[in-house]
Regions:
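Helical segment within the ABC ATPase nucleotide-binding domain
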Residues: 191-206
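Conserved catalytic motifs of ABC-family nucleotide-binding domains
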Residues: 173
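A short, surface-exposed alpha-helical micro-motif characterized by mixed small hydrophobic
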Residues: 220-222
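ABC ATPase "signature
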Residues: 238-239
């Protein structure tokens, strides 16, 4: 891992969401609009060639943080940058450095095949046709989709769609890769391949930076160089697994996680948008 400028920079990041639900609430509250603080003064950096794991219960703010880093949301306070590009003021440049695999939103053309979908997204990234075709074949084979490469995506299972979403995120060999629970719907073989690929190939050989949100503590400990534990919008601890355990006064990562987080109350997906 490099000691150079972080590939991912997060400084005092905060995000508020309005609590009002509709037009009548705005009429009842013309001057004061209550908000919910979803992220609060979050700061950390991720180096080139590093896999950073983001842990935390549902509702902790993980998805909100990843969406800000992916330029899908703007922060209320603080700043964030990818490969030196501010995600608000240089969002187009930041997106060119980024590969993003969200937790649920697939955004595929269901009547097109897996290969046709990847060709489309490769063209959006201005990838040359011949290298793109080779890259698509390689990724589909590695992710176990080679036999379904010409099948319409509407026939894919949830796990197959997840693998295709990962292939799309990897397609243009991004400098920064952001993954939201990428192995949740994967079979053990595909999950093992992805873990190896993230640490050994992307981070180890290509020097890419990977930020992955996960609930799987064993996976996080095996795959990630460092971890951050997020709870109630605040970063409670960060460092290697051993450092996180030391900060929590715990013997294991599972014990540290239990001490650093509160019981889950509501899913993050249920909070106001």
């Amino acid at each position: 891992m490099s000691a150079m400028t972080p590939a991912v920079e997060v400084e005092n990041l905060g995000k508020n969401f309005p609590l009002v639900r509709g037009g009548l609430d705005w009429l009842r509250l013309p001057f004061a609009h209550p908000t919910k603080r979803v992220l609060n003064e979050v700061s950390f950096g991720v180096a080139p060639g590093e896999v950073f794991g983001l842990l935390g219960p549902n509702g902790a703010g993980k998805t909100t943080l990843l969406k800000i880093l992916s330029t899908l949301l703007e922060p209320s306070t603080g700043r964030a940058a990818l490969a030196g590009c501010d995600v608000v003021h240089q969002s187009a440049a930041a997106r060119r450095q980024l590969g993003y695999c969200p937790g649920f939103d697939r955004a595929f053309y269901l009547r097109l095949s897996a290969r046709e979908n990847l060709r489309f997204y490769g063209a959006l990234n201005n990838l040359p046709r011949r290298p793109l075709a080779e890259r698509i074949s390689s990724l589909l084979a590695a992710l176990g989709l080679d036999g379904a490469r010409d099948e319409p995506v509407r026939n894919f299972s949830t796990g197959m769609l997840q693998r295709l979403a990962i292939a799309r995120a990897l397609l243009h060999q991004p400098r920064v890769l952001i993954l939201d629970e990428p192995t949740r719907s994967l079979d053990p073989t595909a999950a093992a391949w992805l873990r190896r690929h993230l640490r050994e190939e992307l981070a180890g050989r290509q020097g890419a930076t990977v930020l992955v949100a996960t609930h799987n503590l064993t996976e996080a400990e095996e795959t990630c160089h460092r971890l951050g534990v997020l709870d109630q919008g605040r970063l409670q601890a960060a460092g290697t697994a051993k450092e996180v355990c030391r900060q929590a006064g715990a013997a294991t990562l599972a014990e540290a996680y239990a001490r650093l987080t509160t019981p889950e109350k509501a899913s993050e997906e249920a909070r106001p948008r």
